[in-house]
Structures are given as C-alpha cells and as structure tokens.
C-alpha cells in the first residue's frame, strides 16, 4: 500500500437509574422488549427499523437532559420543517500533525485519532483542560496531547518514554480511551480498550488515574475484528462493545455486546452478542466508484443531552487491493445517527456530516475516522475530532 499521512482535525457545529433489563421502562418511557438486547434475524441493506418511533410511549418523561427534536418521538403534530446541519472544518486544520520522530515510525507518518479519545477533564491534578489520545506512528503506540481551548494542541513530554508524549508503546489497531466520570476508584478514572495482537486481534482493558500511566491488562477479550470500539451508555449504565464483524451481503458490520461492569464485560461467548448495525441502501456511494456498496467501517457513540449520538464511519471503497494498485485512499466519511434506547439508531440525514477531499496528500484525503467520546460541548458549539 502506498505510504500515507494522517493528522487530526477539529470541526464545530452550532448547537441547534440503573441498567434496565428486558421488560423494564427507561428514563424516557420506552419499554425494552423482554429479550434484550434484541436479536435481529439478519442484517440487510434495508434501513434499521426503530420500534419506539413506530409505537412511542403514551407518556414520555422529559426530565433527563434537554429534549432534541431529531425525530418525531416528541412530536404529535407540527407544521415546522426539520433542518439538519453539517459540521464545518476549522480554518486551522489540521490541529494536530506528525511533527515528532516517533510519529513517523511504522509504514507511514500518523498522528490522528483512530477512535482513541478526546476529553475535557475538569479534575485533572495538573489543572482542568482538554486531553487527546491518538495513534502516533502507524500502529506503533498511543500518544497524548493537551490543549486549553480544544483547538491549539501541545505535546508535553511525559515520563513513560523520556522526552516523548507516548503513554503506551504497543502494536495496536483500533483503541478507545474513556474518561469514566462515574468510576469510584480514582485509579480507574481512565479506561483504555485497545487492540492486542495475540493469535489474532483481541481487546485489552487498561486503567489509569491520569491517562498517562496505565495498568497492565485487567482483562483480555475473545478474538475480535480489528476496528472494534467501546463506549458507555450512562442512561442505562452499561458499557457497550461495538464489535467489528463481517456479514454476508453487507460486508463490514457491527455486533452488540453490553455489560454493567467494564472488566467482567470483557469476557463473552457468541450467545452474549447480537447482530446490530450495517450500512444500508440509503448510505452514500463513492462518486468515482458508484458500483461499490457502502459498508460500516466503524461505529462510535456518546450520550448527548437526552439521547445517544452515533457516529457511523461509512466505507465507500474501493477495496484495499484496488486502492494499493491505484495508489489512492479508501474512502471513509462520518455520518450521524440517534438512539433513545441505545440499540436502535434513527438516521434521518444521509449526507456526509464530516466529509473528505480527493486531493492527493491533503490531511483529510479520502479517509476520516471519529474520536472516542464523540464530541465535546464548548460554549455554544460541539467540537468533533477526526
């Protein structure tokens, strides 16, 4: 494959109880089915059905978060027209680039989130501020950057590898760093779910009090697909594993796994997972390769106000072998979805929320990936990082 470079960028968008098992009622009045998570018989190119939109609760409590009109869940009748907005790239992009020797190691220079995580930590002993964990050097390790405003980033040296901002040197693919505000143990405030090459890809869970010094793996998962990620659903107080799978007819897709405990949840059997998400017939195609069917390359999610915000990385091809032959990037762009039960995602707008350029060598040439943690609320804007 042709050597490529990857850097991190920022976008902004102007803001327009315990885990409930099957049969129980959620914070918004939705009653979960007896079998939870739901068992989809198959994945197909048809858009995902969203049961709570077809049959909403008779009474909808609205005392959790601001209520967002991204669907008709809260609307009985209206003459208004819903308008969706797209993210805007910041004028100073890329906000993080490969400017350190260790970021130029591996098959290609790399300094960008590959999920990983971008967070604002209000209780950091060194002072509140923005923190970014990113892939530094292609598959070579995880680095950490800091910022006072979320736009201008620095890479202060750490004591893990003297003179560098490396927090963990490890052969990795996908990784998620999560700031767990609900964690009672201060040594586990930060959680890193990172891929581990051990007889195929597996997921290892590390914890840290500061996001710099990480524990040895507290748990290692069964075999997984390389682009597997994890997020926390605070409405139901469960961790969710977004498991990368391949499925006949739709290609790259997702299986679902949830557990209230991050460590215990790292061990599962096939029966503990459920078919979940895939690209469908409404997703965009590559403008130069329209014959290639879209696939779901990755899926991250985060709680925002009164719902779960999903970031769908839609792969539009061409296949890796063809990319190598043509010396181009495979095309991945980020689209949005919304969920009120954490499983069924409504996707009303299929435009490219965070798009790419076809300009050879540009920082966002062909391929962008969402950050773990989804987005940050900064004033009256949302900051997204890719």
Regions found by a protein language model. Give the residues of each.
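Bacterial N-terminal signal peptides that target proteins for export
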Residues: 1-9
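Bacterial N-terminal signal peptides
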Residues: 8-16
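Carbohydrate-active catalytic/glycan-binding domains of CAZyme proteins
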Residues: 20-386
